[in-house]
């Protein structure tokens, strides 16, 4: 039995996709800890994992709720700092620089054999590797380096085989790099520079750190391999896959401990539409208007029915003229609802999209920010659904899009075919096999 520590970027969209893998490791007899902020402790323990506190004094329980309020009520630089988790990263870089820091001490005290750290937590990976611990980078995002005719994941460009597509992808990478520089200036923090300094501080080569469309990443290598929790079938074609990068299963947790959904108000004979903008719907400025647009669309379609998950910030009473065929909830279990869903309206979070594919549900995607435009583009590329603008779509246009996806059998056929690949990979569990091959028989760590 090995002791394994998982730590994910402090958002539900990163944490939840790791649960299936964590449970699979537990089922193999390993002891699995999660290193996380206090706000996630209860949810982590509910899934059956051990918990290690992370920055308990600086980010006590209740921090996430306070941050939600700040995000909803700020603009400009303050907004960018919050959604970029700048305060968290400042604390992380400061802590891992310290030789005898509490994170390192916790890892050594429990006899950690292997660390599975989010690709967005590269500072942790560098610290743990320097301490002699085995590390695997765990990516729920497709945050891969630049390649020919491979647009950055922050854009909604859908590539094709034309010379113009090659040029467009190259220009998009240039603009993406410029956008990162501007963001760094606005928030007053250069993540690429800080991560490079940290790498050299720990004795690694400066070129270990490379730019990417989202967060600067560690160059793929066999010393710190990267598991991408997304099947390669969903990605755009790449000229080659770099050594040390492994596309794996979608890692869909079908056994999350959540309240059972009440189906008494749902008519099994009507098409069911499920709408969610994820756990952080409040960070998208058009989200309130968008939710109302979806509700207005349903008012003219009594032959359809809708379940809408509003997220933690919005309340049902804030929306007007809600018809009887609409249920408004703050949170709903995707895994319980998707098997009965005809079409999903989503913000394009990679976790939600993977779940839709797994359950053969075509999509209408309205990407918010970060990497969501890139996943929406992949949905269009593979003909799994349609893409629209969250801030511009009208009720009439949305009805047309939903009609097209529901009535055109090609979308259902394409998503079902990819769903078969997803389920086959889930059963094969290549990530689990790769992780177990990395577990050391003997372990020597720096004190």
Predicted features along the sequence, with ranges:
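Conserved nucleotide-sugar donor-interacting segment of glycosyltransferase catalytic cores
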Residues: 92-173, 221-222, 226, 232-235
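Conserved nucleotide-sugar donor-binding subdomain of glycosyltransferases
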Residues: 68-124, 176-218
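Nucleotide-activated sugar donor-binding and catalytic core shared by glycosyltransferases
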Residues: 2-10, 17-33, 39, 43-50, ...
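Donor nucleotide-sugar binding/catalytic pocket of nucleotide-sugar-dependent glycosyltransferases
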Residues: 212-214, 221-235, 242-253
């Amino acid at each position: 039995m090995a002791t394994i520590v998982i730590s994910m970027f402090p958002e539900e969209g990163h944490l939840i996709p790791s649960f299936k893998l964590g449970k699979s490791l537990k089922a193999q007899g390993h002891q699995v800890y999660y290193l996380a902020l206090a706000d996630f402790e209860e949810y982590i323990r509910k899934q059956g994992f051990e918990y290690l506190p992370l920055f308990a004094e600086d980010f006590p329980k209740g921090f996430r709720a306070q941050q939600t309020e700040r995000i909803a009520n700020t603009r400009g630089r303050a907004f960018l700092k919050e959604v970029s988790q700048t305060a968290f990263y400042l604390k992380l870089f400061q802590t891992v620089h310290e030789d005898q820091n509490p994170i390192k001490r916790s890892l050594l005290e429990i006899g950690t054999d292997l660390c599975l750290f989010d690709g967005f937590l590269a500072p942790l990976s560098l610290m743990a590797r320097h301490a002699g611990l085995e590390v695997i980078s765990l990516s729920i995002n497709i945050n891969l380096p630049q390649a020919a005719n491979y647009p950055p994941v922050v854009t909604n460009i859908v590539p094709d085989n034309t010379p113009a597509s090659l040029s467009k992808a190259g220009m998009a990478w240039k603009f993406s790099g410029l956008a990162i520089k501007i963001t760094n200036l606005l928030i007053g923090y250069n993540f690429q520079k800080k991560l490079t300094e940290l790498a050299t501080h720990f004795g690694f080569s400066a070129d270990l750190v490379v730019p990417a469309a989202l967060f600067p990443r560690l160059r793929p290598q066999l010393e710190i391999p990267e598991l991408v929790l997304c099947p390669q079938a969903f990605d755009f074609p790449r000229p080659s896959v770099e050594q040390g990068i492994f596309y794996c299963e979608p890692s869909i947790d079908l056994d999350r401990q959540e309240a059972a959904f009440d189906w008494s108000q749902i008519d099994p004979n009507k098409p069911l539409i499920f709408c969610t903008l994820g756990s952080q719907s409040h960070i998208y400025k058009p989200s309130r208007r968008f939710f109302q647009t979806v509700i207005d669309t349903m008012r003219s379609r009594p032959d359809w029915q809708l379940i809408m998950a509003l997220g933690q910030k919005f309340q049902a009473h804030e929306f007007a003229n809600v018809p009887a065929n609409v249920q408004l909830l703050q949170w709903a279990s995707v895994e319980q609802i998707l098997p009965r869903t005809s079409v999903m309206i989503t913000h394009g979070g990679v976790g939600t999209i993977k779940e839709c594919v797994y359950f053969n549900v075509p999509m209408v995607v309205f990407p918010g920010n970060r990497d969501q435009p890139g996943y929406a583009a992949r949905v269009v590329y593979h003909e799994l659904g349609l893409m629209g603008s969250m801030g511009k779509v009208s009720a009439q246009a949305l009805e047309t899009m939903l009609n097209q996806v529901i009535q055109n059998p090609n979308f259902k056929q394409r998503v079902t075919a990819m769903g078969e690949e997803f389920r086959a990979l889930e059963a094969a569990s290549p990530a689990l096999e790769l992780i177990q091959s990395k577990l050391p028989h003997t372990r020597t760590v720096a004190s």
